[in-house]
């Protein structure tokens, strides 16, 4: 195994072990320090996050409509490795995964009944704002962050033959420095953010499955149950990781889409169908109409509303950035053979539509119960809001078990994808990292999630991941500069070659 791994593996293991040890020995101390640091960053650099993430969206749109969009992520005659449906399924599963199920009902309810962006809860305007801001937080901006990182990795790896490392994308502007300490530091930030972000999500996934089992069957909401769940899921995702990308992750992602589609369709039919579709349509219009205002909204003279923006919008932008090395590298790996335009439209548009539909169905179903006084969904914990909502619609047990299976499969695909990406990043960018390396990362992630659930340090570790987003956002800006420089150069070369290949019209001598 040792010959397959780079020094980044050992450096990140040491840093992660130190963070986990701190979380075990003194979780309150880690929580206080990380929370204070996070508060300082959101207060002092909130404007920066809003500007850079909006820049990411703008750059993606520019590339879609630019002639550069015709360039293929691979050799000119290369075909996509995965079919369109499997590709969409893997994008969706890796990009949002557990978060969609965790917050499907919880975020709209929170914006509507607990803490509204407008300040007034449980009003008709709060209802509209709830869905609009949920779309905003999970929409174009989130996927643009992923798309930028994925595009840079895919272009330099499949078009230029560079290793599949974050640092390799900066070679046009940093030169040989990417092979030295600077490159190692960049890769360490990316790997650390991935390990911490995914471990946190695994912990949240275990708590939601446990919350669902407790709500449905009265199984105790306790660490020992969560530990058993983590062990079971770990065995399953390690088996999937061992089987390879083309089998395990692909089949699980396709299964995810089928299960999610069945649950969505059922709830659309038995829920407040007309209200759901009206809200879906209205909220898309509201989202498009207000996207610029929401993208730059800081309310500097209104501390209460600014606190809401810090807690939601800026938190989300930092969280998506901290996840972008993992999701971006995975998306790049499964996108070989597509043009830049096809890639960006696929990554930005399709997941957004599915995400908006998901939140409309489950969010509106929950908010409808709340506004009619049929059930106080807002009183439930975040991890049980989905189950509380399902409890008030037909076939409760069937839909709840389906939701539990969906969470478990998302759990497995997220961890499986992460072990693959971590294996790549610590094996010199290998497209097929050794199983021993993937298994090592799988065990490390699960152990971290279990230890921090036990010590109560999971929230503190989540804050730590978000802190890594600030330096990594600067890395993404450098990646954009590097990519644009390379794409512009290649575009000039293509135009020059086209001119040389263009047949000259024969000269006709004039008769005098």
From Swiss-Prot:
Q: Which InterPro entries did the record assign?
A: BCCT_CS (IPR018093), BCCT_transptr (IPR000060)
Query: What PROSITE patterns does the annotation carry?
Result: BCCT
Q: Which residues cross the membrane?
A: 5-25, 45-65, 82-102, 135-155, 186-206, 222-242, 257-277, 312-332, 343-363, 395-415, 441-461, 464-484
Superkingdom is Bacteria
Q: List the Gene Ontology MF annotations in alphabetical order.
A: transmembrane transporter activity
* Bilayer topology annotation: Multi-pass membrane protein
Pfam families assigned to the protein according to its UniProt record, in alphabetical order: BCCT
Region forming the signal peptide: none
The reply to whether Nucleotidyltransferase figures as a keyword in the UniProt entry is no
User: Can you supply one Gene Ontology CC term for this chain's record?
Assistant: plasma membrane
The protein's UniProt keywords, in alphabetical order, are: Cell membrane, Membrane, Transmembrane, Transmembrane helix, Transport
> Tell me, what controls this protein's activity?
Activity is stimulated by high osmolarity.
Q: Which family does it belong to?
A: Belongs to the BCCT transporter (TC 2.A.15) family.
Q: What is this protein called?
A: Glycine betaine transporter OpuD
């Amino acid at each position: 195994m040792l010959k397959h791994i780079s020094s980044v593996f050992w450096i990140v293991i040491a840093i992660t072990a130190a963070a986990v040890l701190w979380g075990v020995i003194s979780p309150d101390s880690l929580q206080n320090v990380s929370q204070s640091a996070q508060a300082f960053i959101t207060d002092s650099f909130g404007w920066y996050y809003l500007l850079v993430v909006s820049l990411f969206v703008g750059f993606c749109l520019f590339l879609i409509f630019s002639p550069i969009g015709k360039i293929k992520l691979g050799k000119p005659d290369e075909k996509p490795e995965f079919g369109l449906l499997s590709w969409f399924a893997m994008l969706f599963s890796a990009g949002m995964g557990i978060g969609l199920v965790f917050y499907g009902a919880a975020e709209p309810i929170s914006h509507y009944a607990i803490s509204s962006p407008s300040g007034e809860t449980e009003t008709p305007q709060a209802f509209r704002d709830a869905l609009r801001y949920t779309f905003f937080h999970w929409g174009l901006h989130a996927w643009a962050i992923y798309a930028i990182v994925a595009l840079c990795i895919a272009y330099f790896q499949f078009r230029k033959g560079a290793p599949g490392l974050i640092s390799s994308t900066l070679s046009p502007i940093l030169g040989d420095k990417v092979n030295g300490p600077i490159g190692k530091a960049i890769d360490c930030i990316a790997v650390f953010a991935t390990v911490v972000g995914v471990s946190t999500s695994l912990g949240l996934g275990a708590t939601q499955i446990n919350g669902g089992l407790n709500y449905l069957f009265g199984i105790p909401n306790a660490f020992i149950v969560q530990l058993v769940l983590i062990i079971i899921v770990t065995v399953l995702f390690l088996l999937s990781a061992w089987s390879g990308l083309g089998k395990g992750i692909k089949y699980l992602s396709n299964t995810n889409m089928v299960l999610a589609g069945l649950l969505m369709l059922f709830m659309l039919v038995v829920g407040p169908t007309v209200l759901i579709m009206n809200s879906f349509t209205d909220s898309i219009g509201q989202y498009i109409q207000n996207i610029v205002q929401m993208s730059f909204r800081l309310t500097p003279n209104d501390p209460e509303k600014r606190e809401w923006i810090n807690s939601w919008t800026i938190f989300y932008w930092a969280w998506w950035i901290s996840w972008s090395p993992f999701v971006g590298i995975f998306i790049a790996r499964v996108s070989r053979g597509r043009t830049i335009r096809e890639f960006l439209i696929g990554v930005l548009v399709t997941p957004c539509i599915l995400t908006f539909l998901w939140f409309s169905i489950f969010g509106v179903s929950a908010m409808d119960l709340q506004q009619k006084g049929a059930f106080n969904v807002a009183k439930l914990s975040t991890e049980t809001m989905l189950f509380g909502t399902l409890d008030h619609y037909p076939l409760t047990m069937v839909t709840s078990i389906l939701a539990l299976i969906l969470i478990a499969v998302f759990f497995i695909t997220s961890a499986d994808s992460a072990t693959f990406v971590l294996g790549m990043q610590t094996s010199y960018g290998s497209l097929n990292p050794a199983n021993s390396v993937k298994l090592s990362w799988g065990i490390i992630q699960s152990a971290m999630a279990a230890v921090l659930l036990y010590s109560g340090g999971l929230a503190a570790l989540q804050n730590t991941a978000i802190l890594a987003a600030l330096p990594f956002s600067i890395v993404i800006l450098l990646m954009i500069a590097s990519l644009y420089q390379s794409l512009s150069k290649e575009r000039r070369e293509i135009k020059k070659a086209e001119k040389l290949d263009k047949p000259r019209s024969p000269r006709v001598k004039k008769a005098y």
